[in-house]
């Protein structure tokens, strides 16, 4: 896939977008936090309401390209941070957010780009990291102790017999 960000941007449809919009009522303005920016579906929809501001986060450095378009289109209304959503508190701080949205799960951009190493269908290296600067699965398997791998699989993989 030559340009995974453009394909994600045009093909990703956020889960339950209209239901989220209905519940959040962005037409009245406010600050909305998109903790899993990805292709920008939620952020773009919230920004259609002229009184809204969006703070968006994504740990994947490829996503920055998509965010730049929105920063240009919505100056002083769209703010992107290349960070993990677990850091949302340090980013939002004491600002009162009207809603915080998480579209959890793997991103299409990561699954569809074979170089990211999430698929067993290709001969690419095993990466499986959410961001490009993180430790790959291949590095973890080759460098972590057996005990550490068991612990990771047991806790994060919820596999009690690891």
Name these PLM-found stretches:
Residues 1-162:
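S-adenosyl-L-methionine-dependent methyltransferase catalytic core, i.e., the SAM/SAH-binding region
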